[in-house]
Amino acid sequence: MFRPIAAGIVAVVLLTACAPEDAGDTEPADFARSVCAGLTSWRDGVATESAELTRSLDGANDVATVRSRYGHFFTSTVRRTDQLIHTVDTAGAPKVDHGRGYSRDLTAALKSARSGLASAQKSFAALPTSDLAGYAAGARKIRDSLGGVLTQVGTTLDELGQTYTSGDLNRAFGDEPACQRLSGT
């Protein structure tokens, strides 16, 4: 009678010891697909809107027009980032060692980028509107500073790959076409 119970306890202990530590519930391939599709959509959307902004400003000769177009750009970029954060949250955490930590750190990095974008949006709204040339120069400077915010997302992804060294997760990211498009491979 005690042998089946003892064998059951040993099996539970062994299974627990072999289970990934701090793992999530999402298969690595599903996680990579969701995250990279979200990141690709975000990156492409921001790039398209930035190019459209540049084209739309050609010939703009009043502060109201310039302000409106930049306002649309910043609002769209913050909204896209909110959508990306939601996508990553919805993806859950990968079922790998420290998958919850990976997901948590990725979400924190995206929230930091969102904060930087929202800060740029506030700086933009505070620009003086009395001089078109000065206003446009200030707006361009703020927009150009966004490059650092956006680049930080890519840097964070690289750092996460080095910090969380799950072979299964790295393989899933490497095999996922959306991730390959992000990395240019």
What does each model-identified segment do?
Residues 1-8:
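Bacterial N-terminal signal peptides that target proteins for export
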Residues 12, 30, 172-173:
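Processing junctions and N-termini across compartments
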Residues 21-76, 178-184:
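Immediate post-signal-peptide N-terminus of mature secreted/exported proteins
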Residues 33-47, 68-82, 104-118, 137-151:
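Generic structural signal for well-ordered, non-transmembrane alpha-helical segments
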Residues 46, 50-53, 81-92, 117, ...:
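Extended amphipathic alpha-helical scaffold segments
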Residues 82-107, 119-132, 160:
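Short, solvent-exposed, charged loop/turn and helix-capping segments
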Residues 116-182:
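A charged, solvent-exposed segment within the mature domains of Sec-exported extracytoplasmic proteins
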